[in-house]
C-alpha cells in the first residue's frame, strides 16, 4: 500500500494549534489545490470530543468560507480527521499559512456567537448522518481553546520522518 503524505511527518513533534500545508497539486487546467492540516490538538495527547467535533464540522466550513474565500482562494472541503486531532481543508489557491490562521481564529469567534443548538446548519435527520450526536457546548469549548492559543505553523521539512525511521517502522 502506498504511504500517504500525512504519515511521513513525525506526529510526536507537531505543534497545536497549528496550520500545515499537507499537500499541493496542480489540476489538468493548471489550478493549484492546497490541502491544509489544521491541527487543533497535540497528537496522542489530546483529542476533540466526538459531539463537539461533529458540531464544529457543521459550523466550521461555512465560517471559514466567509473569512478565507476570495482573492484567489476557494475552499473545496473541510473534514475532520479520523484521529479527532484536527481537520483537513482542501482549497483552490495557495494562501499563506498566516492568512489561514487568521481566518481560522475568525471562524472560531463566529462559533462562539452561535446561541442555540437550533442554529447549527443541517442539523436534521435528512441532512446529517448522525443528527443526534451534537454538542454546541463542546464545539464552543474547542473554539475557546483555539482563541486562547497562538496558532502556529508546522513545516513539513521540520517534521519529516527520516528514511531510516520509515524503514524501521516498516513503511
UniProtKB/Swiss-Prot annotation:
Question: What binding details are noted for the cofactor?
Answer: Binds 1 Fe cation per subunit.
The EC class name is lyase
> Endoplasmic reticulum as a keyword?
no
Instruction: Name a biological process GO annotation.
Output: quorum sensing
Report residues binding Fe cation.
54, 58, 128
Q: Which cofactor does it need?
A: Fe cation
Asked if the record carries the keyword NADP, the reply is: no
Gene Ontology MF annotations: iron ion binding; S-ribosylhomocysteine lyase activity
What are the protein's UniProt keywords? Autoinducer synthesis, Iron, Lyase, Metal-binding, Quorum sensing
Q: What is its EC number?
A: 4.4.1.21
Q: Which Gene3D superfamilies match?
A: S-ribosylhomocysteinase (LuxS) (3.30.1360.80)
Catalytic activity entry: S-(5-deoxy-D-ribos-5-yl)-L-homocysteine = (S)-4,5-dihydroxypentane-2,3-dione + L-homocysteine
One Pfam family from the UniProt entry?
A: LuxS
Provide the assembly information: Homodimer.
Function, as annotated: Involved in the synthesis of autoinducer 2 (AI-2) which is secreted by bacteria and is used to communicate both the cell density and the metabolic potential of the environment. The regulation of gene expression in response to changes in cell density is called quorum sensing. Catalyzes the transformation of S-ribosylhomocysteine (RHC) to homocysteine (HC) and 4,5-dihydroxy-2,3-pentadione (DPD).
* Family matches, as HAMAP family: LuxS (MF_00091)
Task: Identify its protein family.
Answer: Belongs to the LuxS family.
PANTHER family, from UniProt? S-RIBOSYLHOMOCYSTEINE LYASE
Name of this protein: S-ribosylhomocysteine lyase
Taxonomic lineage: Bacteria, Pseudomonadati, Pseudomonadota, Gammaproteobacteria, Enterobacterales
